[in-house]
Every structure is written in structure tokens, then in C-alpha cells.
Amino acid sequence: MFLLLPFDSLIVNLLGISLTVLFTLLLVFIIVPAIFGVSFGIRKLYMKSLLKIFAWATLRMERGAKEKNHQLYKPYTNGIIAKDPTSLEEEIKEIRRSGSSKALDNTPEFELSDIFYFCRKGMETIMDDEVTKRFSAEELESWNLLSRTNYNFQYISLRLTVLWGLGVLIRYCFLLPLRIALAFTGISLLVVGTTVVGYLPNGRFKEFMSKHVHLMCYRICVRALTAIITYHDRENRPRNGGICVANHTSPIDVIILASDGYYAMVGQVHGGLMGVIQRAMVKACPHVWFERSEVKDRHLVAKRLTEHVQDKSKLPILIFPEGTCINNTSVMMFKKGSFEIGATVYPVAIKYDPQFGDAFWNSSKYGMVTYLLRMMTSWAIVCSVWYLPPMTREADEDAVQFANRVKSAIARQGGLVDLLWDGGLKREKVKDTFKEEQQKLYSKMIVGNHKDRSRS
């Protein structure tokens, strides 16, 4: 039989006491408040402390840059090229005026100087195109003491290096284990809780239990990210029989919204851990899961969604119409499918603060596990959520126009750039129709003017 020495026994006892104290603190200050939806203000105090540290770090770097007679790096938030919203015809007119006395109205034929317009546009796009930069992390104006964001902040003193090292210890040795424990607790409770609720007979009690199990587990998962969320205009929260649409930055958008409301999720059936969670959730709540073969069938998807929203007793559906994650600086084209089914749409704008941690999931660069590790080793996830008034499709509006109107409202409220480009360009090649459109505009300008002159 293995006997412990007195010293070994003391260490084991101290370790047991430490784990007991840690679990008790975890239960009292994080899990129980999450269950009841209350906060002791610890996260907000933590956020204010971080802001003071970041401000001090910025001052130190500015001083270091000044001593070396260098200018501290500042990102170009509005792009590196000043662009005026002018049409192709107006710009070519301007080029022709500056190059010769001929004007477009008098000379409908092609001029060699027209090439300069297309060359300039091509170079501008290569240097500062407004689409592809939406698929990479947003640049920071000041360093947040994360090594992954220290690409442009070079003037780091010894004090800053020590502070950064202390931050690494805190994030990886304290926050990461704590967050993993909370995430494991939240996911385990979600699977077990929804499975148990699934065996209850249908009725109000089952709905009540399902709602509170979902809210409790999502709130624990929110705390696993040290998420500090500010919800605005909560009287506009989505109601049964409607569709909640939001801009999409990250998979955690779902947790952010579901920790404040009760939604039916829409998505593809997965395997592995995600599949276990999906099967457990659908037992307690009427989520809409599609098989891989069904996802590409637009008519089947629309039919399932229409059947769901027509039943006013069912939960609002949560949908991200962009179809991919964008870096939270803009809102890109909304797919029209969810706007064709005639339901009331509840727009939601989500804006993250990248100063504490970048929530954007660059799926072409990072896998899910790597992404979650980056999230759990960030300082915090800070964001604001705005619930906008419900919107319905007008009589003279088609689905595309309605989708664009909702998108514009979300972009305006969240302070995001409203873009018409498809987020699918992250992975797909630009369609030839986009190139052909520019060719048509130019040929119409030349041929159209020539026809007008012939008629006269």
C-alpha cells in the first residue's frame, strides 16, 4: 500500500482546500449570478481597470516614439485613399477635360485617355479595396497588450514588456482555466438540462423550463468569455412568430443574443460535440435543423421557415442573413430568403469593441478550436446590442429591397459601413457578371451618346 509522507500529505490537503475554495468562489460569484441573471459589477470594474492600463501603455509608446523622432502608428479607419462618390461617366468627363479640349458630349468615340480611369480604379482596388479588408481583423488605434495585435506598435519599453508578461500569465494561467471550466459547465448543463426537459409532456411548464434552462446555460457561457454586454431598447426584443436578423461577426453572436432572449435556431445538422448539443436542444425546443442535402434546396428551407413563423406560439427564428462572418466594420449583402416568407422582421445590431479582444472569426485562417482559444485568452469580449423596432415588407417592395432596407437600418444603428457586396466573396471568385457590368456601363456611355447624336 502506498503511504504519503507528512509533507506530501500537507501538499495534497492544501491542494484539496484550494480547489474547494476555487469551486466555491466560482459557484457563488459566477454560476449562481448567471443562473439568476444578476451581476455584482466585477466585470465592469475589470473593464475600467483595463481601459486605464491601455491608456497608460499608449502614453508610454507615444513617449518612446517621440524620443526616437518617429510618429506613432495610426490606422486609416476610413481607408488610405480618399474616394468621391462619382459615376464612371462623370470621372471620364473630368479626365477628358483635363487632357484635351474635347468633351464627352462632342466626342462619343473611344479616347485613349479613357484607359487612365480604368488603370486608376484597378490600382485603387489593389491598394485599398472596400471588400476584402472586411474579411481580416480590424486594426487597433492603440495596443491592447496582446501579442497577436502588436504588428504596428513597436515602441515598447521595459515596463511595458514586464506588464505584457504579467498579462500573459494572468490570461493563460488564471483566466484560461477558469473560462474552460465555465464553458464545460455551461455546455454540460445545456446538454443534460435540455435532454431532461425533452421528456416532460408538452405544455406551459415544459416551455417555462426550456426557456430558463437555455437562458441559464447561455449566461454561463457568456461568463466563460468574460463578455460585457450592453443591451439597448429591450422593449423591441423579438416576439413569437417573427424573425430576428442580425449582422454576423462570430459564432458567439448566438450566445450574445440567446443570453437575453429565447430563440429557435436555424442551421445545418452537424456531427461530433455540436451534433450532441443540437440533438439535445431540439428535444426541449422546436429548433429548425436541416440535413446537409436539404440546405441547398431553397424551396424546402423557405417552406420549413414559413411553417414555423405561421405558428404564432413558436419562438422567433434567429438568422444571420449575411451567411458568413464579417469583421464588424460593415454589413454586407443580406440573402433574400428570410425576407420572402412574409414574417415580421426584428432587426438587431451587434457592435463589438476590438480594444479588449477581436471577436471576428476569420474562418479561412483559423479553425474553430484555434478561434475559441483566441477568444478565451483575450482580455474580454465587450459589445453593445441594439434591438431595433420591428419591420414589415411594404406592398411595393420586393424581397431584395426589403432586405436592403433592414440592412441599412442595422448598419446605421451600429455605426457600420453599409455595403452591397456579397460576403460570399470571402471564399468565391468574383463573378464575371461584375466585370461585364462595368463594360456595359462604359459601352452604354459611348454607344448611347452616339445613338442620341444620330437621332438629332
Curated annotation (Swiss-Prot):
Asked whether the keyword Mitochondrion is assigned, the reply is: no
Name the enzyme's class: transferase
N-terminal signal peptide: 1-37
Q: Which GO terms describe its biological process?
A: acyl-CoA metabolic process; CDP-diacylglycerol biosynthetic process; diacylglycerol metabolic process; fatty acid metabolic process; glandular epithelial cell maturation; lactation; lipid biosynthetic process; phosphatidic acid biosynthetic process
Residue positions the entry lists as glycosylated = 247, 327-328, 362
Main localization, broad class: endoplasmic reticulum
In short, the EC number is 2.3.1.15
Keyword vocabulary terms for this entry: Acyltransferase, Endoplasmic reticulum, Glycoprotein, Lipid biosynthesis, Lipid metabolism, Membrane, Phospholipid biosynthesis, Phospholipid metabolism, Signal, Transferase, Transmembrane, Transmembrane helix
Pathway-wise, it operates in:
Phospholipid metabolism; CDP-diacylglycerol biosynthesis; CDP-diacylglycerol from sn-glycerol 3-phosphate: step 1/3
Entry comment describing in which tissues the protein is expressed: Ubiquitous. High levels in testis. Relatively high level of expression in skeletal muscle and heart. Relatively low level of expression in lung.
Q: How is its activity regulated?
A: Inhibited by N-ethylmaleimide (NEM).
Q: Where is this motif: HXXXXD motif?
A: 248-253
Q: Which domain of life is it from?
A: Eukaryota
The regions listed as transmembrane in this protein's record are 156-176, 180-200
Q: Name one GO cellular component term.
A: endoplasmic reticulum membrane
Q: How does it sit in the membrane?
A: Multi-pass membrane protein
| InterPro entries according to UniProt | LPCAT1-like, Plipid/glycerol_acylTrfase
Catalytic activity annotation: sn-glycerol 3-phosphate + an acyl-CoA = a 1-acyl-sn-glycero-3-phosphate + CoA; dodecanoyl-CoA + sn-glycerol 3-phosphate = 1-dodecanoyl-sn-glycerol 3-phosphate + CoA; sn-glycerol 3-phosphate + hexadecanoyl-CoA = 1-hexadecanoyl-sn-glycero-3-phosphate + CoA; sn-glycerol 3-phosphate + octadecanoyl-CoA = 1-octadecanoyl-sn-glycero-3-phosphate + CoA
Entry keyword annotation includes Cell membrane:
no
Family membership noted in the UniProt record: Belongs to the 1-acyl-sn-glycerol-3-phosphate acyltransferase family.
Protein name from the UniProt record? Glycerol-3-phosphate acyltransferase 4
| Species this protein is from | Homo sapiens (Human)
